[in-house]
Amino acid sequence: MSTIIMDLCSYTRLGLSGYLVSRGVKKREINDIETVDELAIACGAHQPSVVFINEDCFIHTPSDSQQIKQIINQHPDTLFIVFMAIANVHFDEYLLVRKNLLISSKSIKPDSLDTLLGDILKKESGISGTINLPTLSLSRTESSMLRMWMEGQGTIQISDRMNIKAKTVSSHKGNIKRKIKTHNKQVIYHVVRLTDNVTNGIFVNMR
């Protein structure tokens, strides 16, 4: 199983490599790279099953973010796991934001990786591994409300603008927190911004 690790932190690279080797991946199938250009070449050459990327490797340069987005789209059979670069926040969850794109905390546990990668690690030639996770999506109301919330508007302002009761706004906020698996506003904003960066945004259910 070919894998790519794009993370400037040697501690993380070592941890991920150790995890993969312990699960039967051969060392020669684990490729460390540093730049987005190298990632594009490596994905084309190796057709990896899984790519681990630290968002710090691309988030500060719009052209790099755009290229990451293209690479993810060009390799639908590769699972991309993007680690959030967010400090001093307890969040060890992960979210599937596209069929082949997962946003994760760096604090993800080996057991969680086993759950996510189990089928892929066991994958025999010609059998595609899949992730049994719902893709993150919001209703139109939740999506509109989340944007206002991120603009710094409070419950009453959102209630007035959307012409709904404050209690309903609070209920929608609760749904958003449940779907993004955190009550931490900083993490919610971070997930939204990162998803916007490498996709066209969190899926909105148009029904």
UniProtKB/Swiss-Prot annotation:
DNA-binding region (UniProt annotation): 155-174
Keyword DNA-binding belongs to the record: yes
GO biological process entries: regulation of DNA-templated transcription
GO molecular function: DNA binding
UniProt-listed InterPro entries: RcsA, Sig_transdc_resp-reg_C-effctor, Tscrpt_reg_LuxR_C, WH-like_DNA-bd_sf
The entry's keywords: DNA-binding, Sensory transduction, Transcription, Transcription regulation
Transmembrane segments: none
Pfam families referenced in this protein's UniProt entry, alphabetically: GerE
Taxonomic superkingdom: Bacteria
Domain HTH luxR-type: residue ranges: 131-196
Protein family (similarity comment): Belongs to the RcsA family.
Oligomer and partners: Interacts with RcsB.
Function of the molecule: Component of the Rcs signaling system, which controls transcription of numerous genes. Binds, with RcsB, to the RcsAB box to regulate expression of genes.
NCBIfam families: PRK15411.1
Annotated protein name in UniProt: Transcriptional regulatory protein RcsA
Taxonomic lineage: Bacteria, Pseudomonadati, Pseudomonadota, Gammaproteobacteria, Enterobacterales
